[in-house]
Regions:
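Non-heme di-metal
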Residues: 1-157
Length: 157
């Protein structure tokens, strides 16, 4: 159990998430998944003895983004809007990790993965015909969280 609070990423990113129309929301989330993939790649460098598993998590984040972009192909307008929003959203996301060690950051990310799984479940109300696909996305998120939760007790701060 972490001796610090895991941020609520929905609240942390609310300003950015609310800056897009509902139909662009999945694309914005997909770009945040790519941001998480970048974090995993960084941790793979920080903890090279576990690079294989961390890079698999990065690949999972990219897979989620690819699936979402396939499910909800963004219009040119939505791509442009998200391109304007994502730098600040990424900065906000990264700021939640700034004062922590890589191991603590991975602890936070495990919580973020579980929150991400919940976010995909919440979208089922807007897109009930995509429920199975959202379940699959949530399963991928939970797989990364489970990996981190298994890895973290083996690491020392």
């Amino acid at each position: 159990m972490a001796d610090f609070e895991i941020p609520n990423f929905g609240e942390l990113l609310a300003e950015h998430l609310g800056a897009v129309p509902p139909e662009a929301y999945p694309f914005l989330l997909s770009q945040l998944e790519r941001t998480a993939a970048d974090r995993y790649r960084g941790w793979a460098q920080d903890v090279p003895e576990h690079a294989e598993g961390l890079l698999a998590c990065a690949q999972s984040e990219d897979e989620i983004a690819d699936r979402v972009e396939s499910m909800f192909p963004p219009s040119a307008e939505h791509r442009a809007l998200v391109a304007r929003i994502i730098p600040e959203a990424k900065e906000t996301y990264y700021s939640a990790f700034d004062s922590f060690t890589p191991i603590q950051q991975m602890t936070i990310q495990a919580g973020a993965e579980r929150q991400g799984a919940g976010a995909w479940q919440n979208l089922k109300t807007l897109y009930p015909d995509r429920a199975d696909e959202f379940d699959a996305l949530s399963k991928i998120e939970l797989g990364s969280a489970d990996y981190l939760n298994t890895l973290l007790p083996t690491l020392l701060d």
